Design a protein with these regions (language model features):
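Short arginine-rich
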Residues: 78-103
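Short aromatic-glycine-(Arg/Gly/Cys) micro-motifs in beta-strand/loop hairpins
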Residues: 34-62, 174-187
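N-terminal "first-domain core" detector
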Residues: 1-49
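Ordered hydrophobic segments in well-structured contexts
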Residues: 30-32, 40-42, 51-53, 76, ...
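Generic surface-pattern signal
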Residues: 3, 7-18, 78, 82, ...
Length: 191
């Protein structure tokens, strides 16, 4: 199953040193990604599901999100590994909004696990994900409004074109607040 996403993974990791390590600890087969051996993102397949987890110190088998839908899995991979790619290439980060999903776009149902909900697309009932209500989930659901190919291309492009340029972050507002507070910065004439 994860083999279907190999080409996508290869494209996102191309021309970078984003580490892709095999992950197989009795929890299925997959990959763990990191930039500097911190902040691991792990993707694996198990029993017909794509599963995803995030952890700080080492890859974790405690999944936060799972889906059977290849397209939804692709959006998760692009968002998470694409962010690692941009950081490694020292490109401006893309800040994907993390608002709660709209009831017009996603239905939310309880599962047998207390903190886990099932999110189903109202336009494509095959797009189903079970997850805790995490920022990563909300970013993934937001991302599905864009065509997948355009979404991938935006993470590959330094200016985040064609669809994500409005979500590029900037340090300028932070620097302006520092200047307003009287902090002299190296770029100031009077530094």
């Amino acid at each position: 199953m994860l083999g279907k996403l190999e080409e996508l993974i290869g494209k996102i990791c191309s021309d970078t040193s984003v580490a892709k390590a095999d992950f197989q600890q009795g929890y299925g087969y997959g990959y763990s990604f990191s930039n500097y051996n911190t902040d691991f993102f792990t993707a694996w397949e198990m029993s017909g599901y794509y599963r995803f987890s995030w952890s700080e110190r080492h890859p974790s088998e405690q999944f936060t999100m799972d889906t059977r839908n290849e397209t939804l899995a692709s959006y998760v991979l692009v968002t998470q590994v694409g962010a690692l790619r941009r950081a490694r290439l020292r490109q401006r980060p893309i800040v994907i909004p993390g608002e709660a999903p709209s009831p017009q776009q996603w239905t939310i149902a309880d599962t047998r696990w207390p903190r886990v909900k099932r999110y189903t697309s109202t336009t494509d009932p095959t797009m189903v994900v079970e997850s805790v209500n995490s920022l990563e989930l909300r970013q993934t659901l937001f991302a599905t409004q864009f065509p997948l190919e355009d979404y991938v291309d935006s993470f590959m492009d330094p200016d985040a074109n064609p669809v994500l340029s409005p979500y590029l972050s900037s340090v300028e507002p932070h620097l302006e607040r520092l200047r307003d507070a009287g902090v002299k910065l190296p770029t100031d004439d009077s530094y």
